[in-house]
């Protein structure tokens, strides 16, 4: 999906059926940081919370992680993530892009392990960190 204006601020979503990680990133720096983890029921978030994030951050675009298989083929979750992206576009009229998110959760757990977290991923989930990593990946591939 093409954007009509320069993309300066973006929100990234690491889609999941129980939790959706959210991050914010800036095109000028190419960096992203984790914001929050939204609870979801069978992949459906609290749309009021999503709307509040959109209003607060006023992003120019959204990036949704696309969970591909290791061979690059679509996974069972790929269609659900794409549908989530279409819903974001329909509700908020923002450009939505997808980005390969393979190994972002693995990398996020590695970062947390390096910070000393050995377990407790329910109490301190890595979904928002995974969203930041996938958003940084998208920003690296799409420099302004």
Swiss-Prot record:
SUPFAM superfamilies reported in the protein's UniProt record: Ribonuclease H-like
GO annotation, biological process: rRNA 5'-end processing
First-listed, main subcellular location of the protein, grouped into a coarse class: cytoplasm
Cellular-component GO terms for this entry: cytosol
Gene3D superfamilies to which the protein is assigned, alphabetical: YqgF/RNase H-like domain (3.30.420.140)
Domain of life per record: Bacteria
EC number: 3.1.-.-
GO MF assignments: nuclease activity
UniProt keyword terms in alphabetical order: Cytoplasm, Hydrolase, Nuclease, Ribosome biogenesis
Coiled coil, from the record: none
Similarity annotation: Belongs to the YqgF nuclease family.
Stated role: Could be a nuclease involved in processing of the 5'-end of pre-16S rRNA.
HAMAP family: Nuclease_YqgF
Protein name stated in the entry: Putative pre-16S rRNA nuclease
Species in which this protein is naturally found: Pseudomonas paraeruginosa (strain DSM 24068 / PA7)
């Amino acid at each position: 999906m093409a954007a009509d204006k320069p993309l300066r601020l973006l929100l990234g979503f690491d889609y999941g059926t129980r939790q959706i990680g959210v991050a914010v990133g800036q095109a000028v720096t190419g960096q992203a940081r984790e914001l929050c983890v939204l609870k979801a029921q069978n992949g459906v978030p609290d749309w009021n919370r999503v709307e509040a994030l959109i209003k607060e951050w006023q992003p120019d675009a959204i990036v949704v992680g696309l969970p591909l298989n290791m061979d690059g083929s679509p996974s069972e979750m790929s269609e659900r993530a794409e549908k989530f992206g279409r819903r974001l576009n329909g509700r908020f009229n923002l450009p939505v892009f997808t980005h390969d998110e393979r190994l972002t959760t693995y990398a996020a757990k590695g970062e947390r392990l390096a910070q000393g977290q050995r377990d407790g991923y329910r109490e301190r989930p890595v979904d928002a960190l995974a969203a930041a990593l996938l958003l940084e990946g998208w920003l690296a591939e799409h420099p302004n």
